[in-house]
Swiss-Prot record:
Residues 71-149 are annotated as: Domain II. Residues 154-209 are annotated as: Domain III. This is Holliday junction branch migration complex subunit RuvA. Homotetramer. Forms an RuvA(8)-RuvB(12)-Holliday junction (HJ) complex. HJ DNA is sandwiched between 2 RuvA tetramers; dsDNA enters through RuvA and exits via RuvB. An RuvB hexamer assembles on each DNA strand where it exits the tetramer. Each RuvB hexamer is contacted by two RuvA subunits (via domain III) on 2 adjacent RuvB subunits; this complex drives branch migration. In the full resolvosome a probable DNA-RuvA(4)-RuvB(12)-RuvC(2) complex forms which resolves the HJ. InterPro entries: DNA_helicase_Holl-junc_RuvA_I (IPR013849), Hlx-hairpin-Hlx_DNA-bd_motif (IPR003583), NA-bd_OB-fold (IPR012340), RuvA (IPR000085), RuvA_2-like (IPR010994), RuvA_C (IPR011114). Residues 1-70 are annotated as: Domain I. Belongs to the RuvA family. The gene is ruvA. NCBIfam families: ruvA.
Length: 209
């Protein structure tokens, strides 16, 4: 099994299913590697330059498929995700494209099903299964790769009620994230599991901007 490939980025292309592929030339051999959309955008600006891509290979009846990542941590998290029943390679890539590594690990560890379900193809039941099967593993895994914790936030139930209420009131997701980040700096409020109090404080804060 390959650990990584080092070569020249020749091209980035997107197929009819919307999946991104990197053509990486290594010693006169062009490898076609599926990569997350975020990484594809970065690589598109670096065509013709040497690249170090961490890979996961998957053998199927119709051939060998390669999936590429910018770091060993991203590749390892991909492997953790596809170990869960019902999460295939495309679901794992969708999760990695929707959330940053720290955000994704945090969402799983804290069982934030709403955050996980933002990824295309990931429903509530799949999000619950992810948290159930991986939360203890990823708590230790995060320390191994020295991934930072995301900023402190209200618990998942409060977060969901708060976000849904503010969305219903017409606020944008960027405004909501900013308000939650600001309110989460209050250590006393963080200990409060009353969603109504969070909502009241958030509306007050947003009305001042």
């Amino acid at each position: 099994m390959f650990s990584y490939l080092k070569g020249e980025a020749i091209a980035i292309h997107r197929n009819l299913q919307g999946r991104f592929f990197l053509i990486l030339e290594v010693r006169d051999i062009g490898y076609e590697i599926q990569v997350p959309g975020r990484l594809a955008q970065e690589l598109a600006a670096a065509i013709g330059q040497p690249q170090h891509i961490f890979v996961h290979s998957q053998q199927r009846e119709d051939g060998t498929y390669l999936y590429g990542f910018a770091s060993a941590a991203a590749r390892d998290l991909f492997r953790q995700l596809i170990s869960v029943s019902g999460i295939g390679a495309q679901g794992a890539i969708a999760l990695l494209d929707t959330l940053t590594l720290p955000e994704l690990v945090q969402a799983i560890v804290t069982a934030d099903h709403r955050q996980l379900a933002k990824a295309p193809g990931i429903g509530k039941k799949t999000a619950e299964r992810l948290a159930l099967e991986l939360r203890s593993k990823l708590s230790q895994w995060r320390d191994q790769f020295s991934l930072p914790d995301t900023a402190a936030q209200p618990n998942a139930a409060v977060h969901e009620d708060l976000e849904l209420t503010l969305l219903a009131l017409g606020y944008q997701e960027t405004e909501i994230r900013g308000a939650i980040a600001t309110l989460s700096q209050d250590s006393i409020l963080l200990q409060n599991d009353n969603a109504d109090e969070w909502i009241r404080r958030a509306i007050t804060l947003l009305s001042q901007t």
